[in-house]
Amino acid sequence: MVRDTRNVDLERGLELCKPEKVNKQNLFTNIIKPQKDKINIKTDKIKFFLNNLFTEFSKFHDSCYPDGRISTRSKLRWPLLIIWCILIVFAIDKNFEVKDFLSIWINESFINENRFYSEIWGPIAIYICLFVLLLLGLIYCSKIVVKAIPLISIVIAAVVVIIAVAMVKILYICHWLLQNFNFGFRHKS
């Protein structure tokens, strides 16, 4: 007589799901711990990025303004602000791997000819817009802070970090908009 084995796997699965059969240690080791480790790695990466940013900002501030004062009338203000914006954009690319994220769009747009040009020009336009916004934000801050104590450099660095994080967030939102609404020019076939 042939035994019906259709429900054997289902019965075995239900048996393993019983509370007394679940091994909580294995659940933690196989599911929760890897996720926790990933979060810790990302947190360490962000801490390292912020530490580097604060260190570089302190060096920059001390070399340009040894007495701890920031002058809005300095002729070097514009070039320094532009250089800082470029450095922050590259720092975000280096630490958060935005470049690799953007390369996916570009590769896909060349593989599939029906995709929109926005996937190539979109990221470039986003970077330019973010660069201008960051520059305007820093100029606005420099107009408010005419003479500052050395401690104000920490506040300015914190504002720059918040803007940098916002830039990454805006990048992801713009990616979603480009994918869902297909802004841009159609590829002529």
UniProtKB/Swiss-Prot annotation:
<dbReference type="Pfam" id="PF06198">
    <property type="entry name" value="DUF999"/>
</dbReference>
<keyword id="KW-0472">Membrane</keyword>
<dbReference type="InterPro" id="IPR009340">
    <property type="entry name" value="DUF999"/>
</dbReference>
<feature type="transmembrane region" description="Helical">
    <location>
        <begin position="78"/>
        <end position="98"/>
    </location>
</feature>
<comment type="similarity">
    <text>Belongs to the UPF0494 family.</text>
</comment>
<keyword id="KW-1133">Transmembrane helix</keyword>
<feature type="transmembrane region" description="Helical">
    <location>
        <begin position="120"/>
        <end position="140"/>
    </location>
</feature>
<keyword id="KW-0812">Transmembrane</keyword>
<protein>
    <recommendedName>
        <fullName>UPF0494 membrane protein C977.06</fullName>
    </recommendedName>
</protein>
<feature type="transmembrane region" description="Helical">
    <location>
        <begin position="148"/>
        <end position="168"/>
    </location>
</feature>
<dbReference type="GO" id="GO:0016020">
    <property type="term" value="C:membrane"/>
</dbReference>
